[in-house]
Every structure is written in C-alpha cells, then in structure tokens.
C-alpha cells in the first residue's frame, strides 16, 4: 500500500525542495541541555519527555521536563551500538538500536524495557528481508531505520531509505525474539530520508520528520503528515 501525505517544510541552506502543501507555525520551542547534544530519539507524554543519545554514548534514558531540564537519568544494562529512536506505552519503553547508515549490520535490535523495573529488558532481534551487509553501499541502501512509534498494539518501524527514497513501514511482532522484516506499506514522494515519526491523536495521522542533503554538506529538514489508512 502506498500512502498519501501532506508536506510541510522547514527549509535551510541551498537544498531544493518541492513547493510545500501547507505552512508550519512553531508555537513553543524547548532547548535541550548539553548532555543531550547527540540526542537521536524523543518521546513526549503529559508529564514530560524522554530522550536518549546516539551511538557510542552511555546507555541512559533521560527524563526531561518541558522547560528543557533533565529531571532523572535511568541507566540501562545495555550497550548503545546505534540508538536511533525511543517510544513508549504505559508499560514499556522501546529503544531502537537500529542505526545502519553504512549498511554493515546484518541484524539490528529493539529493546523492550519494563517501565516499573528497568532491569527487566527483552530484546527483539530484527533482520531485513533482502539485506546483504557485504554488498550494501554506505549511505546508498534501504536497510536503515531511525523512526519508530507504538500505536495501539502495533510497534511500527519506518525505514531511512537512502537508495530509493521510498519509505518502508514494518510491523514488529513483540512476541517474536528473532524475526525477518518485510514492509507491509510504503510512502512515496517524501523529499528526503525519514528520521522521526509520531502519531497525532487529535488529527488521527502520522507526523514524520526527516531531512534532505546534498554533496556539499547542505541540509534541509521537512515535516510531513501521513494518513493512517494503511493500518
């Protein structure tokens, strides 16, 4: 299934984008502290935000209030190979150790952390159908992901598709400790690679963020709204 979308752009530098379909107004902005300088995932709930840092950093979940202050740090008995996303439900945190820009990982992981006992961690090991780490070209393959969201009973992973630009959506089975993923839906027409996703409960649609870059190191970010019709 190919999804429809509405595109909003936050543009910068010299990267060319298609004309946006809607405007975007920022009402509130929160500055994260320096210890989250390499933040790669963010999940928001009523009482505050939770975040984490990118690959190689200490395996911590940071609890942050809406003034941008860290109120708690939770260390996990894990290794941060390449953490890229965090989402949650009332019972669990889900940490996506799925970064694979260079395409050299044969398998990636999602850690399911009990919110009431963070020492209770279950790891889901994932392989992508068709992935061959020996033949992937760095930054030119589709077996990478940086966006994840938990919606109802579904844990959804969105690809960072360097090669085709077509975003693949995977439904992760939490009951299977080892599984091979094939996409059940895709999104065409996004102007760049996807790095974040959340679900807008009020509007009943997905909100996707990402960026486009050029060979000269220029970056421009985008935000897109996507129908949930594929669920």
Q: Across the structure, where does each feature detected by a protein language model lie?
A:
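Sequence/structural signature of beta-propeller domains
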Residues: 15-231
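Sec-dependent signal peptide recognition
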Residues: 1-6
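C-terminal motif of bacterial Sec signal peptides marking the signal peptidase cleavage site
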Residues: 11-12
